[in-house]
Amino acid sequence: MSFLKNQKKISGAELFIKCLEQEGVEYIFGLPGEENLDFLEHLSKSNKIKLILTRHEQGAGFMAATYGRLTGKAGVCLSTLGPGATNLITSAAYAQLGGMPMVMITGQKPIKSSKQGKFQILDVVDLMQPI
């Protein structure tokens, strides 16, 4: 990660965006939510990756999967926590069954900094395990 050599301090979201850029990601399909606003703020500064705003996470997932199918490059989709992440499950199964490369990004703040406490907190990794 040569881009880190001259960096004094970098956030996790900014580092993630730079890694996606290095991997050649051109588009991210998804929608904003409280849990991914920092990521989206840094994404808006990227001149290499364009956000394709969707109306629903499931649509974002299918767009990313189909992008992967048509280009052979990983399609990337973005959701917020809880129900937003569970809305990606059907498109994850579609991508897996069709051999389509896809990366799904979701966010979750530490519970102590969330206004809602544990509301909508799900173990997304366990939910995706069968797929």
Regions found by a protein language model. Name each.
Residues 2-131:
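N-terminal alpha/beta PP-like core and its mobile active-site loop of ThDP/TPP-dependent enzymes
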